[in-house]
Amino acid sequence: MELKKLGKVAKGQDGAVFGGMLFRFDATGTCFVYKIRDLSEESTPLCQFVLDKADRIAPHSNSVAFGCARYEEKDEFPLLYSNIYNNYAKADDPLKGVTCVYRLQRQGDSFCTTLVQLIEIGFTDDPVWCSGADVRPYGNFAIDKEKGLYYAFTMRDASQTMEYFSFPMPALSDGIYDEALGVKRVTLCKKDILEQFSCPYQQYIQGAVCHKGIIYSLEGFTDSAENPPAIRLVDTAAKKQTCLTYFKDLGTTVEPELIDFEDGICYYADHDGNVFVLNF
């Protein structure tokens, strides 16, 4: 692997790429939009926006992805997915395993979103998901667009493994109406699991993406010897980890955050906003 620097954007969490634009999210629901072709060391965002209802339910955006389906067929953008992760870790309801689904619309250089659905893992307190004293029991997700699958995966501390679950991708019409948020909430139960498998433990999961059946999952913290920045490749067909690469071997030790593909190109960004093409 090698990194090729493209420029610098706002600090933040994961994000997504679509139509030659990079959408960089922070942990409060704010997104900065950049044209990839215009990236430089002093990149100016095309615009910024705040996710709908972020004052009531704000994703950490530990994992972000565009799906395949659109809210309306004529929409420019597919549905946008962003997870809560640990934003409500100290709340009565920590919203473990919850992903928010948005309709993204553009008018000129302005963007707005509408919260249209919630997807939640309905068994986060079950031993099949958690192992008792997990430090981060919130789970990440990745979407296999080619096969129409929703992958959820979580850190299991007791067994020192990652547990992966696949589900049919929820349709926008699925779910039960949530009066509080005014959208449908899909609860994925154990009976909905298509496949389940274990892989080696990851040291604090960050952004993730599924591309051609491979989950590219980031992990680690800046300059941490105990939890070094790294990327793992998980083959969902073979149900095994096929690659572990430490970013120090690629010339950086900054916390990894964002990863996505467009037109066969892998885009990667760290917490500080450095954006690269990641070549394999």
State what each model feature region is.
Residues 3-31, 206-207, 216:
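Beta-strand-rich domains and repeat architectures in extracellular enzymes and scaffolds
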Residues 4, 43-62, 106-136, 174-202, ...:
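Surface-exposed loop and turn segments in beta-propeller and other repeat-based domains
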Residues 28-36, 79, 87-105, 158-172, ...:
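Structural motif
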Residues 76-142, 146:
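Hydrophobic alpha-helical segments and helix pairs
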Residues 255-280:
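Blade-level signature of beta-propeller repeat domains, shared across WD40, Kelch, NHL, RCC1
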